[in-house]
């Protein structure tokens, strides 16, 4: 019976993934609370559901054959994972409690994945490196070197495959022979931008390509915004390398802050428009200044150690860096007269 329920839930999530925009909080929140099968049944039966979504949602739901969708995806080397799967990164569950930005939010109903590696294992030691699409030579160099060194030190680099800083981050990780995760705004079978098709294939072969949007889906503005929360949600912390005040990188930074995870920034020239956003984050104390991979690792480990020592929340140990896990049992409890470190 439990197996049948799990199958029904997975198929319902496939149907929702094919019909509902990624990060639609009206759905993601309810699915997390009540389950996908129950919410799908409501959407199929509700007479006034069209007035809330603005299109004939019930008809769209009825056109989806989820088993066929999974079969077609598998033929392309694409799998669909959902909360509760052993491969599901449990840290994404924190997105249930972070509200919304630009009407996007919540834990994904599922993720479409390309690549042979295990997403949960890759994400347990991940750092997001994001920044301007119109990166300067300075930004490209900093993103490449930072990501190369992070990967060489055993960290997975998460980014969005965009022009500029994103592609530099992926390339830096690949040069080091390390893991990288590309989170796309459209289907994992659709390289965006098209000029990065070869890079996408390299990541699919040596890393992982992930999307909340189903195979075949194209990128849209709302899907870019939804994608940013997945980038932040997968990572232990986020580094911004260049980014204007209003940019996708700063949106990802806001998600990181909402998740109470370390936000870091590589400072840029005061004369560079590309660095106005990240420089402002640093000036306002919203991001710590980092200049190399060791700075990043120190910030991430310090944050994790404080969270464990302070008991702020029950952390999934797979998400805490190994050096912190190995020492947390030696941390005296508050009953022993040792207070938590100051934030």
Question: Residue spans of the language-model regions?
Answer:
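Glycine-biased, small-residue-rich flexible motifs in mid-sequence functional cores and linkers
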Residues: 1-8, 21, 84-343
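Short, small/acidic-rich helices and loops at N termini and domain boundaries
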Residues: 1-95, 284
């Amino acid at each position: 019976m439990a197996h049948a329920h799990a199958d029904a839930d997975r198929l319902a999530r496939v149907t929702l993934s094919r019909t509902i925009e990624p990060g639609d909080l009206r759905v993601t929140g309810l699915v997390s609370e009540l389950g996908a099968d129950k919410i799908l049944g409501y959407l199929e039966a509700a007479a006034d559901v069209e007035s809330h979504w603005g299109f004939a949602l019930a008809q769209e739901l009825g056109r989806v054959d989820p088993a066929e969708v999974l079969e077609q995806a598998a033929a392309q080397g694409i799998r669909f994972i959902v909360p509760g799967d052993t491969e599901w990164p449990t840290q994404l569950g924190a997105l249930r409690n972070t509200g919304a930005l630009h009407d996007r939010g919540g834990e994904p109903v599922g993720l479409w994945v390309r690549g042979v590696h295990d997403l949960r294992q890759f994400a347990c030691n991940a750092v997001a490196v994001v920044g301007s699409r119109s990166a300067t030579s300075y930004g490209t160099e900093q993103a490449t070197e930072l990501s190369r060194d992070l990967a060489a030190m055993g960290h997975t680099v998460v980014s969005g495959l965009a022009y500029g800083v994103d592609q530099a981050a992926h390339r830096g990780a690949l040069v080091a022979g390390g893991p990288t995760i590309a989170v796309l705004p459209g289907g994992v079978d659709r390289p965006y931008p098209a000029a990065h098709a070869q890079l996408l294939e390299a990541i699919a072969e040596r890393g992982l390509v992930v999307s909340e949007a189903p195979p075949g889906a194209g990128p849209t503005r709302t899907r870019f915004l939804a994608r940013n929360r997945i980038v932040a949600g997968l990572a232990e912390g986020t580094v911004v390398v260049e980014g204007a005040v209003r940019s996708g990188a700063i949106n990802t930074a806001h998600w990181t802050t909402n998740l109470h995870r370390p936000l870091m920034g590589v400072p840029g020239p005061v004369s560079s428009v590309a660095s106005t956003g990240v420089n402002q984050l640093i000036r306002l104390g919203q991001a710590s200044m980092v200049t190399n991979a060791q700075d990043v690792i120190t910030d991430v480990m310090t944050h994790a150690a404080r969270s464990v020592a302070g008991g702020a929340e029950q952390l999934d140990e797979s998400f805490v860096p190994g050096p912190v896990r190995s020492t947390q049992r030696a941390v005296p409890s508050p009953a022993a007269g040792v207070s938590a470190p100051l934030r």
